[in-house]
């Protein structure tokens, strides 16, 4: 992307920064998390996969907005196992200690290849 900006093929503002996305996500979450709430469906793991879930602790801990509800559920598809000790293989309960999920948040993990499982889940949800 940077090379295209340097060549003046695209503007740097074509793509939002991580900060811009987090600000947008916080506004979206505040507008949509009332009532039944908003669930979190994560494909994969690690730092990149965990980025958007951090909007809740940012609002609750950093901004001190104590009326922010936790995610209403958490589901992750991951092929990384806990025994390897990687961040991608961390179980959903670890997210409780960081304020990303509540102890009562329903948590699910599907240990499989996301390229196989995600399309099956999406097809079921869409009624295909």
Positions of the model-derived regions?
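Extended aliphatic helical segments
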Residues: 5, 10, 23, 38, ...
């Amino acid at each position: 992307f940077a090379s295209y900006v340097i060549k003046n093929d695209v503007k740097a503002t074509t793509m939002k920064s991580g900060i811009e996305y987090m600000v947008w996500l916080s506004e979206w979450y505040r507008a949509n998390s009332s009532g039944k709430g908003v669930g979190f469906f994560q494909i994969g793991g690690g730092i990149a996969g965990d980025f958007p879930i951090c909007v809740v602790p940012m609002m609750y801990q950093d901004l001190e907005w104590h009326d922010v509800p936790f995610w209403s559920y958490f589901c992750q598809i991951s092929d990384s196992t806990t025994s390897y000790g990687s961040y991608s293989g961390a179980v959903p309960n670890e997210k409780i200690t960081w304020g990303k999920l509540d102890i009562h948040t329903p948590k699910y993990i599907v240990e499989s290849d996301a390229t196989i499982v995600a399309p099956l889940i999406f097809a079921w949800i869409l009624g295909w």
